[in-house]
Structure formats: structure tokens, C-alpha cells
From Swiss-Prot:
An MF annotation (GO) of this entry: ferrochelatase activity
EC number of this enzyme: 4.99.1.9
Originating species: Limosilactobacillus reuteri (strain DSM 20016)
Keywords recorded for this protein, A-Z: Cytoplasm, Heme biosynthesis, Iron, Lyase, Metal-binding, Porphyrin biosynthesis
Identification of the protein by name: Coproporphyrin III ferrochelatase
Subcellular location: Cytoplasm
Binding residues annotated for Fe(2+), in chain numbering: H184, E265
Matches recorded under PROSITE patterns: FERROCHELATASE (PS00534)
Gene: cpfC
Function recorded in the entry: Involved in coproporphyrin-dependent heme b biosynthesis. Catalyzes the insertion of ferrous iron into coproporphyrin III to form Fe-coproporphyrin III.
CDD domains linked: Ferrochelatase_C, Ferrochelatase_N
Length: 310
């Protein structure tokens, strides 16, 4: 008898932190019309002629800085999370796929359909946005139109409780001037076209403030990981860090709820590049709240969510 299947999907990673593999990965990622809305006739010459040749080697350096002996941290943590969820759901078939790179969504679903009667897909993006979740939906529906998709979970009480506990534990371990809640940014144009991402991140921030034993005046919200010249959601994290340092707030705690697993953005952009900006402008300590990664609590949350909605 066939089982039910659960597919956990994250963004993806190059196969190796080498320039050719990073170039292939970036080409796939930056060719997605949900990510880059510019007409392909204008965008592709720019991508192939300027961006990939100049950005690939630089990004490869950043990937090498955070690569582990087991591989890409994003892939490793997602694999471990799958194993833990599988242990909690032995009656299900639990797999993982990546939006870009490997394992591909289409290949994984094709394999799952051989042993699964129904497939539920959970993109590991708490907040819905066209540039991440919609691409997963498109690829899943191409592979299995009948698959059920849980397209967001940032408003789930258990998720907010879990995230707040993670933040509070980190806050209580140190002495900080500010808590910065930093979400992955998206172009402002996407929000103007109806993307719900900003509303969802602002709602999550409000819910976290209610749950945290931290004075609201010590909490700020920001957006990070801006790409390209177009305006993205503000305030930018890097500018916020610079301002906090100049105000004499020398010790900050940063949490990045958009990233459920440690990846290039948390390990390199935040802990290295943003930390350097903060220190160079008078800051002292920048500490990251650990991502949920493969924690037993996060695995249990996913299990409960899927059994309730899957």
C-alpha cells in the first residue's frame, strides 16, 4: 500500500564552492522570472555578459568561507531536518528538494510518486513571496498537479512561540543594546504589485514583540541581502547597523527569520560582512541568533503542521 509523502523544499546551493558550479547555480537562480521581473531580452545579455562573469568568482569565495566538511550548510541542515522529521513520521515518506540546484523538485517528485499516493509540499520559507514560494509552487504543479502545498507558516502560533523562545534564550545569554530582526529583502516593486511579503514580516515582528521579554524600544526591524540597483524594502540591515554603531549601541543581537537553516546569508553576509561594517563604525559585538536548522523543536513543529494541514 502506498504511503503519504512529504517534500521539504529549500532554496538551493551550488554543488561545490567552485566558480564554475557557482556560475551554473547563479545562472539558474537569476534566470527565474519570479526573481528577476525584467524582460529576458534585456536581462539575459546583462546576466550573461556582466553579472555572471564578475559575480561568480566573488560568490564562490563567499561559499568557500562557509562550506563545511560535509558540504553546503543549507543542504546539510536540510538533510538532517528531513531525517528527524522522518523519525517523527515513520508512516510517511519524507524527502527534500531544492528550488535551484540539486536535488531537483521534478526529479524528487517523480521518484516519490512511485511509492506515495499523496504528496504534501512544504517550502521552508516562513513568509510567502513570489520570488521564493511561487517558484516552488510552479515547479511542483508542473511535476504533480495534485500535490498539496502549505505555502507559508509565519503566522502559526507554534512557529512564533518557537522563534521567540530561540531569540529570548540568545538575548538572556548576553548584554545587548538592540535586537535587530532582519528579513531577506525583496524589490519594492514586488510589494507594489501586490506581494504580501512586507505585510507578513511586519505582522511576524509585531507578534514576536508581544512574546519577547525585551523592551520594544530595543527592537528594530530591517531587511538584508539586497541585489542590484533597484530599491528594495527598507530599512536595509547594513545601514541600520551603521546607524546603531554611530549612536553608541555597541552590542547587538541579530535574528534572521527568513532563513530557517544557516546559509550564505547568515554565515557569510551577516556574521562576516555585516559584522565588519558594524565594527568599522564603532560597534563591538554582533551576535546571531542560531537558525532553527535541524533542531528537534523545529522538526516537531513541521510534523505537527503537516499532520494538521497535509
Amino acid at each position: 500500500m502506498k504511503k503519504n509523502g512529504l517534500l521539504l523544499v529549500n532554496l538551493g546551493s551550488p554543488d561545490t564552492p567552485t566558480t564554475p558550479d557557482v556560475k551554473r547555480y547563479l545562472k539558474e537562480f537569476l534566470s527565474d522570472r519570479n526573481v528577476i521581473e525584467m524582460p529576458p531580452a534585456l536581462w539575459q545579455p546583462l546576466l550573461r555578459g556582466i553579472i555572471l562573469p564578475t559575480r561568480s568568482w566573488r560568490s564562490a569565495t563567499f561559499y568557500r568561507n562557509c562550506w563545511t566538511k560535509d558540504g553546503s550548510p543549507l543542504i546539510v541542515y536540510t538533510e538532517r531536518l528531513v531525517a528527524k522529521v522522518q523519525g517523527l513520521m515513520p508512516e510517511w515518506v519524507v524527502k527534500m528538494a531544492m528550488t535551484y540546484g540539486k536535488p531537483k523538485i521534478s526529479d524528487t517528485i517523480t521518484g516519490m510518486k512511485k511509492e506515495c499516493q499523496n504528496i504534501t509540499v512544504l517550502p521552508l520559507f516562513p513568509f510567502f513571496t513570489k520570488s521564493t514560494t511561487q517558484t516552488v509552487i510552479d515547479k511542483v504543479k508542473d511535476a504533480d498537479p495534485e500535490a498539496k502545498i502549505i505555502d507559508r507558516f509565519s503566522a502559526e502560533e507554534d512557529y512564533l512561540d518557537l522563534l521567540a523562545k530561540q531569540i529570548q534564550t540568545a538575548w538572556d545569554r548576553g548584554k545587548y543594546d538592540k535586537l535587530l530582526i532582519s528579513y531577506h529583502g525583496i524589490p519594492t516593486a514586488m510589494v507594489n504589485h501586490g506581494d504580501p511579503y512586507r505585510d507578513e514580516t511586519e505582522a511576524a515582528t509585531a507578534e514576536l514583540i508581544k512574546r519577547l521579554d525585551i523592551p520594544e524600544k530595543q527592537i528594530k526591524m530591517a531587511y538584508q541581502s539586497k541585489f542590484g540597483p533597484m530599491p528594495w524594502l527598507k530599512p536595509y540591515l547594513r545601514n541600520t547597523l551603521l546607524n546603531e554603531a554611530q549612536l553608541g549601541h555597541r552590542d547587538v543581537l541579530v535574528v534572521a527569520p527568513s532563513f530557517v537553516a544557516d546559509c550564505l546569508e547568515t554565515l557569510e553576509e551577516d556574521q562576516v560582512q555585516n559584522y565588519q561594517v558594524f565594527r568599522e563604525n564603532g560597534g563591538n559585538n554582533l551576535v546571531m541568533v542560531p537558525s532553527l536548522n535541524d533542531s528537534p523543536e523545529f522538526a516537531q513543529f513541521i510534523t505537527d503542521l503537516v499532520q494538521r494541514k497535509g
